Amino acid sequence: MEISLLTDVGQKRTNNQDYVNHYVNRAGRTMIILADGMGGHRAGNIASEMAVTDLGVAWVDTQIDTVNEVREWFAHYLEIENQKIHQLGQDEAYRGMGTTLEVLAIIDNQAIYAHIGDSRIGLIRGEEYHQLTSDHSLVNELLKAGQLTPEEAEAHPQKNIITQSIGQKDEIQPDFGTVILESGDYLLLDSDGLTNMISGSEIRDIVTSDIPLADKTETLVRFANNAGGLDNITVALVSMNEEDAE
């Protein structure tokens, strides 16, 4: 397994409210965490870094070695972090703080993930890009209800309004999923600064190109910037080899 992480402020923003990192626990199991923060001043920066770092530090201290244990851990620790960031957000300086969250652990040939917000996790297998997560957003709710066409959703003025975030008052309802991995698969975690700028087919073409993994993440970010770079752009790309998929 090989991992490449990259974050970029983009072309229009003055600060980067995204955060990404990866961690290994005492059983040697890898977790990748990506967050896209929101809130005035530095609240978004703090929320995203805090969520990633708190969860990462907690993961490093575990001996978790099974998919079922990971799912229980996700359910427990994501709500703890939600309440922690919500409490901090009561301070006037951090009013409105919150963050999306993508958390993915790899146990042998399985990936298990938790999803909150409108960042995304995708699987690139062969010549196909599969979006594994469904955005927790107002526009996606309208789309699923048949009140918007995909074209209308793409250009909707309220596209950035999310229906769930880490830091909300109510208990979060994360989406969980697992994927059986095959040799040659790629997993991509990204903030919406990537997927709002480039298509799934462009992502697939870059990820399956014959260049080193770090060059693939750089190319993804460069394409998003060339398309306008309207937001911070963050990617975590994981390449699975034969030993991982056995």
From Swiss-Prot:
This is Protein phosphatase PhpP. Protein phosphatase able to dephosphorylate StkP-P and a phosphothreonine residue in a phosphopeptide synthetic substrate. PhpP and its cognate protein kinase StkP appear to constitute a functional signaling couple in vivo, PhpP's primary role probably being to control phosphorylation levels of StkP and of its targets (which include LocZ, DivIVA and KhpB (also called EloR/Jag)). PhpP thus performs an essential control of StkP activity. Overexpression confers an stkP deletion-like phenotype. Gene3D superfamilies: PPM-type phosphatase domain. Binds 2 manganese ions per subunit. Other divalent cations, such as Mg(2+) or Ca(2+), cannot serve as cofactors. Phosphatase activity is inhibited by NaF but not by okadaic acid. Mn(2+) 2 binds at D36, D192, D231. Its cofactor is Mn(2+). GO terms for cellular component: cytoplasm. Belongs to the PP2C family. Keywords: Cytoplasm, Hydrolase, Manganese, Metal-binding, Protein phosphatase. Residues 2-240 form the PPM-type phosphatase domain. Disruption phenotype: Attempts to construct an in-frame deletion of the phpP gene were unsuccessful and an allele encoding inactive D231A PhpP phosphatase is lethal in a wild-type genetic background. This suggests that PhpP is essential. Another group has generated a phpP deletion using a two-step negative selection strategy, which has a hyper-phosphorylated phenotype. Cells grow more slowly, are smaller and form short chains, reach a lower final density, are more sensitive to oxidative stress, growth is impaired at 40 degrees Celsius, competence is decreased and mild defects are seen in cell division. Its EC number is 3.1.3.16. Strain Rx1 is unencapsulated. It is found in: Cytoplasm. Induction: The phpP and stkP genes form an operon. It catalyses: O-phospho-L-seryl-[protein] + H2O = L-seryl-[protein] + phosphate; O-phospho-L-threonyl-[protein] + H2O = L-threonyl-[protein] + phosphate. Interacts with the kinase domain of StkP. It holds the Pfam family PP2C_2. Mn(2+) 1 binds at D36, G37. GO terms for molecular function: metal ion binding; protein serine/threonine phosphatase activity.
